[in-house]
Amino acid sequence: MLELKSISKKYGVTRALKDVSLTLPQGQIVGLFGENGAGKTTLMKCILGLLSHGGTITLDGASINEKNIERLSFATCEHSFFPALSPKGHRDFYQAHFPRFNDKRFHALMDFFELPMNKPLRAFSAGMKNQFEVVMALSQGADYILMDEPFAGNDVFNREDF
């Protein structure tokens, strides 16, 4: 279970999050909705340990750390991959660093989205980059998959594929 208790975050004097508490059981699909600037991305970055914050975040009762972070994956429209690497290069990197990486799922999703294996990511369109973010998040073998606007930049047909 992913549990957030009284999460708060400020950027200078601007309060991005105030006393946010959530309990997310494994396997549940949850959507966060809010206006631009409401703190959705900030909350996800706090969960992943990318931002300091007030309050506590635990995964099955333990603080998120280097021992359990592999149980979380993240897909973002900010494109968090290495632009010079191809999907094949990313797969090789992830296989080396994420023991639970699912190569069969990776290939099935690459085929589903018809993404090229050997083209550098910097040559992908915005929509293709978003698809690849989702491929990597779903292939990592994580128990919890966080997605931050994974459909941004995709046309309506690609959104239906997702």
Role assignments for model-derived ranges:
Residues 49, 55-68:
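Conserved ABC transporter NBD signature motif
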Residues 156-158:
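Helix N-cap at the start of a conserved alpha-helix in ABC-type nucleotide-binding domains
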Residues 145-149, 154:
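Catalytic Walker B motif of ABC-type/P-loop ATPase nucleotide-binding domains
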Residues 30, 41-50:
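Short, conserved post-Walker A segment of ABC-type ATPase nucleotide-binding domains
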Residues 76-132:
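ABC-family P-loop ATPase nucleotide-binding domains
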Residues 33-35:
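The feature captures the beta-strand-to-loop junction immediately N-terminal to the Walker
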